[in-house]
Amino acid sequence: MFDLDKFWQFFNAEMKKSYSTVAYNAWFKNTKPISFNKKTKEMIIAVESPVAKGYWEKNLASQLIQEAYAYADMEIQPKFEVAGKEGPERLVTPQPRIKTNQEILENRRDEFAQDLQLNSKYTFDTFVQGEGNKLAAGAALAVADNPGSFYNPLFIFGGVGLGKTHLMQAIGHQMLAEKPHAKVVYIQSETFVNDFINSIKNKTQAEFRNKYRNCDLLLVDDIQFFSKKEGIQEEFFHTFETLYNDQKQIVMTSDRLPTEIPELSERLVSRFAWGLQVEITPPDLETRIAILRKKAETDGLAIDDSTLDYIASQVDTNIRELEGALVKVQAHATIEREDINVDLAKEALADLKLVQKNRGLQISKIQEVVANYFQTSTTELKGKKRVKQIVVPRQIAMYLSRELTDSSLPKIGQEFGGKDHTTVMHACDKISRALKTDAEIKAAVYDLKAMLEH
C-alpha cells in the first residue's frame, strides 16, 4: 500500500543527496504533498508560489516521477498547486512577465518607472541553467519568491558575459509580475556614483536618498566600480543599512568577491557577506549547446544538432561570445544564401579561432610550468608543506593564476589542494609587494610570464 508521507520522506532524503543546502531550502523544504489518487495516480503537491510552481513543472517533475517509480514501481501524475494561507488555491497562471512589465512601464508615472531599464528578454523563462550557474539561479529564484527574507543581500559574482545581469533583472521582472506597484530600482554602479555627484552639485541629496532608500528591490550591477571611492562607499553603506533594516531586498553583481575588490571598506565587505555570495562560472559544453538551441529557437533559425555542437565546441569562454558566434554563422548564411550546416559554420568561424584564442591558460598548465622552473612538482605546489623552497613557488603560481586566467580566488584555491580563498589572496598580495623589492622574484615572474604567454 502506497504511503504518501513515507514516500515524501524518501523523496526528500534523495533530494538532499543531490542538491546543495541552498537549492534544497529554496525548492523542497516548504513543498508538501496534499493528496494521492490511487486510481488515477495523480499526486497533488503544494508549492509556495507561482515561481516555484513553474520551476517544479519545468525542472523537478521528472525527478519526482522517477523517484516514485523507484520507490513503489508506479508512474505517478504530479500536479502542482500554489498554496495560500488556507491551502492550495491560487491556481491561475500569472500574466506573462514581459507584458506585465511593459504595462508597468507605460502606466506608472513616478520616478521609479522613469529610471527602470529592465531588459524584457532577461526573465527566468529565458535563462538556461547548467552546472556553472544552477546554484546562482536557485538562489535568484528563492529571492524572487521571498524578497527581503531569503539571502539578503544576494551577491552574484563571476566573469564577463556569464548571465549575472540576466539573473538580477529576472528577479526584478518577477517582483513586478507579482506586485505591479512594487518600487524596483535597477542601476549600474556607475549610475549610482553619477547620481550622487549630481545630487551634491544640484543640492538634491534628499531626493537622491529618497529614490534609493525607499524602494522594495535594489539591483546594483558591477559593484566593483565602487573600488577606492570612499565617499560613494559611505553613501552606499547608509543606503544598504536603511534597506536591510526595512527588510527590503538588495541584489548585487560583481566580477569578483567583495574581499577581492580593491579598497572596499571592511564594513561593506562584512555586510555583503550577511546574505549569500554565489559564483557563476563559464558554461560547460552541454549548457553551451542548450544556450545555442534556445537562441536559435528564439530567432527562428533552423540549425541541426551537429552544427550546434560544432559552434558550442568553438567557444568556451562566455555566453556573450557564444551567441556572437551564432550571429556570425547566421550572417554568413544570409550573405552566401546557404543553409546553416557544419561546413558553413566552419567557414564562418575560421578566422576567429575562438577556442585557441580565448580559452587561455589552464591553472594546471601554470602549475606545471612553475614546478619545472623551480625544480619541484605540482603535487608539492598543491600540498601543505611550509618550507621556503615550496612556499614561494606556490605563491608565484597562485599569483600567475590570478593574473593570467579569469579564475576567481575560490577557484584558484580549489586547484591548489582546496585552499581557502584568503590564502590565495595573501599569496597574491605578497608576490605583488615582492615584485617591487625582490629582484630574484621579479626575474622569476618575468621569465614565467614569458614562457606561459608563448
Swiss-Prot record:
Chain intervals for the UniProt region annotation (Domain I, interacts with DnaA modulators): 1-74
InterPro entries in alphabetical order: AAA+_ATPase, Chromosome_initiator_DnaA, Chromosome_initiator_DnaA-like, Chromosome_initiator_DnaA_CS, DnaA_C, DnaA_dom, DnaA_N_sf, P-loop_NTPase
Annotated ATP binding sites: 161, 163-165
Keyword Nucleus: no
Annotated spans, Domain II: 74-116
Region (Domain III, AAA+ region): 117-333
Subcellular location: Cytoplasm
GO cellular component: cytoplasm; plasma membrane
Any one GO biological process: DNA replication initiation
Location of region: Domain IV, binds dsDNA: 334-454
UniProt keyword list: ATP-binding, Cytoplasm, DNA replication, DNA-binding, Lipid-binding, Nucleotide-binding
GO molecular function, one term: DNA replication origin binding
Family named by the database record: Belongs to the DnaA family.
Domain notes: Domain I is involved in oligomerization and binding regulators, domain II is flexibile and of varying length in different bacteria, domain III forms the AAA+ region, while domain IV binds dsDNA.
The protein's role, per its UniProt record: Plays an essential role in the initiation and regulation of chromosomal replication. ATP-DnaA binds to the origin of replication (oriC) to initiate formation of the DNA replication initiation complex once per cell cycle. Binds the DnaA box (a 9 base pair repeat at the origin) and separates the double-stranded (ds)DNA. Forms a right-handed helical filament on oriC DNA; dsDNA binds to the exterior of the filament while single-stranded (ss)DNA is stabiized in the filament's interior.
Subunit structure: Oligomerizes as a right-handed, spiral filament on DNA at oriC.
NCBIfam families per record: DnaA
Name of the protein in its database record: Chromosomal replication initiator protein DnaA
